[in-house]
């Protein structure tokens, strides 16, 4: 089977690698986003997918706008591919491109469709407190993740899982599902299922304001924001930005889902801690070898990992010691 692969970030790498390993699949070309300038020197950095393609000496095409690039369109046609496989490519494909392969354009999407259509399904599923997510393969159409569904695979989201961890799991799961989808497609063994648009939810691009922590929200909501938008959520501490990288919501609903060292240390103090009256963002206690406990609009939140501006990530307890943090200090929403 001749396949053209469209993809860009690390999430797409396992899918491309799995295709390259398969004896019945021939990856004839890779389409990825143009190299992006990074750092102070604005050095052009290739995408993770381009690096894999270079290692395997596969033709690489990097149009700024694939549907408007006549040269790329001609090359795509000339591949005479059986299928196009698309994994987090980052551009919308035109009807002209979708009709080129003999069998279909297959997309690997990081959610259980029709929930979380869009650019950031993993992040928003965690943000909204989902306890399960997965991968859907689908036949692509001109809409945003609206095509007929082919296969699905599920994975649980644990209380302390963040977007990076779930993305790694789903990237590998998606690679397996892509192979299965392509082989079954070739054998005519798939039964496409139309999406019910009434059940659709959306996962748009994340904006900078989505990263700002509002301490008046529920502790679990802030926790889900921190792990869903990892590693970008921030607050203000002593008039400087402070990234919050890992947290744990505290209380009876969470003990069994937290590591034993957290539950065992805090549970005996819980009656006292939970009766404190403090304002949102205020430090109410410092737990040795763990970190500060912060009051939220509803409930308490333990800060497990943070990052001061210009510094490396550090544990909550190292942050307490390094800044000589005191009970009563406040994190602000500025």
Swiss-Prot record:
Function: Attaches a formyl group to the free amino group of methionyl-tRNA(fMet). The formyl group appears to play a dual role in the initiator identity of N-formylmethionyl-tRNA by promoting its recognition by IF2 and preventing the misappropriation of this tRNA by the elongation apparatus.
Recorded family membership: Belongs to the Fmt family.
Binding site for (6S)-5,6,7,8-tetrahydrofolate: 111-114
Molecular function via GO: methionyl-tRNA formyltransferase activity
Protein name: Methionyl-tRNA formyltransferase
Top-level taxon: Bacteria
PROSITE patterns: GART (PS00373)
Keyword Cell membrane on entry: no
The species this protein was found in: Gloeothece citriformis (strain PCC 7424)
Keyword line: Protein biosynthesis, Transferase
GO cellular component, one term: cytosol
Gene3D superfamilies: 3.40.50.12230
């Amino acid at each position: 089977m001749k396949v053209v692969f469209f993809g860009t970030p690390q999430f797409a790498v396992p899918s491309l690698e799995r295709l390259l390993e398969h004896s019945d699949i021939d990856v004839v070309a890779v389409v990825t986003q143009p190299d992006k300038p990074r750092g102070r020197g604005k050095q052009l950095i290739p995408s993770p997918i381009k690096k894999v393609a270079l290692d395997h000496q596969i033709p690489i095409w990097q149009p700024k706008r694939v549907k408007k690039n006549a040269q790329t369109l001609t090359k795509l046609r000339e591949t005479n591919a059986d299928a196009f496989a698309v994994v987090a490519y980052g551009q919308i494909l035109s009807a002209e491109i979708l009709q080129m392969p003999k069998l279909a354009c297959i997309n690997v999407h990081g959610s259980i469709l029709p929930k979380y259509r869009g650019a950031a399904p993993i992040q928003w599923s965690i943000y909204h407190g989902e306890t399960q997510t997965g991968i859907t393969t689908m036949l692509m159409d001109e809409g945003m993740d609206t095509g007929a569904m082919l296969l699905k695979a599920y994975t649980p989201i644990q209380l302390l899982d963040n977007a990076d961890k779930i993305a790694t799991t789903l990237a590998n799961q998606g690679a397996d599902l892509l192979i299965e989808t392509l082989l079954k497609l070739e054998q005519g063994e798939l039964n496409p299922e139309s999406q019910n648009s009434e059940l659709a939810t959306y996962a748009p691009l994340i904006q900078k304001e989505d990263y700002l922590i509002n301490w008046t929200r529920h502790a679990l909501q802030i926790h889900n924001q921190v792990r869903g938008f990892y590693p970008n959520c921030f607050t203000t501490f002593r008039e400087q930005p402070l990234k919050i990288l890992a947290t744990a919501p505290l209380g009876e609903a969470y003990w069994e889902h937290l590591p034993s060292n957290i539950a065992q240390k805090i549970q005996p103090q819980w009656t006292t801690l939970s009766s404190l009256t403090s304002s949102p963002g205020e430090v109410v206690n410092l737990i040795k070898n763990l970190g500060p406990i912060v009051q939220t609009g509803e409930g308490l939140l333990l800060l497990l990992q943070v990052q001061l501006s210009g510094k490396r990530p550090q544990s909550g307890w190292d942050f307490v010691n390094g800044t000589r943090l005191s009970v009563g200090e406040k994190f602000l929403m500025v």
